[in-house]
Amino acid sequence: MKSKIALAFQKCEKENRPALITYFVGGDGGKKKSLNILNALSKEADLCEIGFSFSTPIADGGEIQNCHHRTLTSGIRIKDIFDIVKKYNKDKDSKPIILMGYYQTIFHYRENKFLKKCKEVGVSGLIVVDLPFPENLPFAKKCKTNSICFLQLISPTTSIQRAKKIIQSSDELNYLVSMLSTTGGKLKVLPKKILENYNKIKKINPIKKLVIGFGITGKTIRSFKNSDGVVLGSTICKEITRSLKLRQNPVTNLSRMVRDLKKKIL
């Protein structure tokens, strides 16, 4: 039986387009509004990443850091993220949910308990930013036991030899970091160069899916039409912050924005 992630990519392949993956910090704007944001994003997205808040999100740039700070100060915790995912997955047409965050949260929750809860609420995948290969292998194995895809991160400086080891041990989906920067950084590398690196990594195992993230915006997304998928994060978080500051409804604004961005990769 194919996983929810595999079925999502299968649908994209039939439509001859990359998967659109959206990211936002769970609980931003409050639990109710956050669920509404997730529902709105998932109408256009093929997979949905949800960040779980952390006080020192070292891989994230200013836009996403603002969201982490906002959710933490409003009292949102990991249990609230699980509640949001559980409610969202009651919809039979729900998209695969990938949780993204930092290992300390998982460590304090306890690995086995955390994965059990993920499985219970219907999480399809996990990205743990500060748990690199090969140290992440025992945890990745636990994820697989719980039918949860552990996404390995591959950076621009990862050698082909190391990339081969990572891909060989990985699950069905991996994440290529586009450049040496935090999330939301301005692309310092031409999309052409990013794609050259992407194609080298993709050739290692063409069957496994590889998506591109970090620095993807409305101006650059079209360049990655031939990849397996693109991740939009900081662009979305920036719009949430702008909407909340102007006391506008982020749900309405995000729906329009993501719909327009998706048209660029069709």
For the regions a language model picked out, list residue spans one by one.
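Glycine-rich phosphate-binding active-site loops on the catalytic face of alpha/beta enzymes
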Residues: 47-57, 125-135, 175-185, 226-246
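Catalytic beta/alpha-barrel core
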Residues: 73-75, 122-135, 149-158, 163, ...
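Short beta-strand/loop segments at the ligand-binding rim of alpha/beta enzyme cores
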Residues: 15-21, 92-102, 143-153, 201-215
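N-terminal amphipathic alpha-helix/helix-capping segment at the start of soluble metabolic enzymes
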Residues: 1-21, 84-90
